[in-house]
């Protein structure tokens, strides 16, 4: 395995357009924030390496466009994802109502045991809030996935959201019995072959 890291996890950010997916990614990867952000066209990604429990984890985080017209492009990125973060905007009821639709997309395109996390973003805009913390938590509990509220603007829980996801995936990987597959699948990244665990075959 590449000595630079112990794990390579591919994460996907999904949710309606305008909920702040790109801002969350920018805050986590670069610790920066932009008041106005151009809508993502198709997909974009950033990489950040983190330490957790003495292990080095390389996170390849893909930011997807929320618009319907890009859905066919973005759906192909679900398949190789180890973890998917579903984001809604606490000041936008419709984005919360659409969470179940996004979860259906995961069921349709992602691998069966992919880790999921529900995130309510823009919690700094308290005066504009229309979705309560309790409503978000109740939905996450119903689905059986972790839940956090975040603010990309003031960095609330952004680090925690991505680290929670990394920890959940790492624990799942550690608890999986060793398969008798001859070799793990390999993806080529920047000229370096990277071992990638394959959890389903077509």
From Swiss-Prot:
Which of this chain's residues are annotated to bind GTP? 15-23, 33-40, 63-67, 121-124, 151-153
In terms of superkingdom, the source organism counts as: Eukaryota
Indicate the segments annotated as coiled coil, or none if absent: none
The record's annotation in SUPFAM superfamilies points to: P-loop containing nucleoside triphosphate hydrolases
| Residues anchoring lipid (S-geranylgeranyl cysteine) | 200-201
SMART domains from the entry? ARF, RAB, RAN, RAS, RHO
Where is the protein found, in the record's own terms? Cell membrane
Keywords from the UniProt entry: Cell membrane, GTP-binding, Lipoprotein, Membrane, Nucleotide-binding, Prenylation, Protein transport, Transport
Work out whether the entry's keyword set contains Cytoplasm: no
GO MF terms, alphabetically ordered: GTP binding; GTPase activity
Q: Where is this region: Disordered?
A: 174-202
Which ranges belong to the motif Effector region? 37-45
Q: Name one GO biological process term.
A: protein transport
**InterPro entries linked:** P-loop_NTPase (IPR027417), Rab (IPR050227), Small_GTP-bd (IPR005225), Small_GTPase (IPR001806)
Family note: Belongs to the small GTPase superfamily. Rab family.
Q: Tell me what this protein is called.
A: Ras-related protein RIC1
What organism, scientifically named, is this protein from? Oryza sativa subsp. japonica
């Amino acid at each position: 395995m590449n000595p630079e890291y112990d794990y390579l996890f591919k994460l996907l950010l999904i949710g309606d357009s305008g909920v702040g997916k790109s801002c969350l990614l920018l805050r986590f990867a670069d610790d920066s924030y932009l008041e106005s952000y151009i809508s993502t066209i198709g997909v974009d990604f950033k990489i950040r390496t983190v330490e957790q429990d003495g292990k080095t984890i390389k996170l390849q985080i893909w930011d997807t466009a929320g618009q319907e017209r890009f859905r066919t492009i973005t759906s192909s990125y679900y398949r190789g994802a180890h973890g998917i973060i579903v984001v809604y905007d606490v000041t936008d009821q419709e984005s919360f109502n659409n969470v179940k639709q996004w979860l259906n997309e995961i069921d349709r395109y992602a691998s069966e045991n992919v880790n999921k996390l529900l995130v309510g973003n823009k919690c700094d805009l308290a005066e504009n809030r229309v979705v309560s913390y309790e409503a978000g938590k109740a939905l996450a509990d119903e689905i059986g996935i972790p839940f956090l509220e975040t603010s990309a603007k003031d960095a609330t829980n952004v680090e925690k959201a991505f680290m929670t996801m990394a920890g959940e995936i790492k624990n799942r990987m550690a608890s999986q019995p060793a398969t008798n597959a001859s070799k793990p699948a390999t993806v080529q990244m920047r000229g370096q072959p990277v071992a990638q665990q394959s959890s389903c075959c077509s």
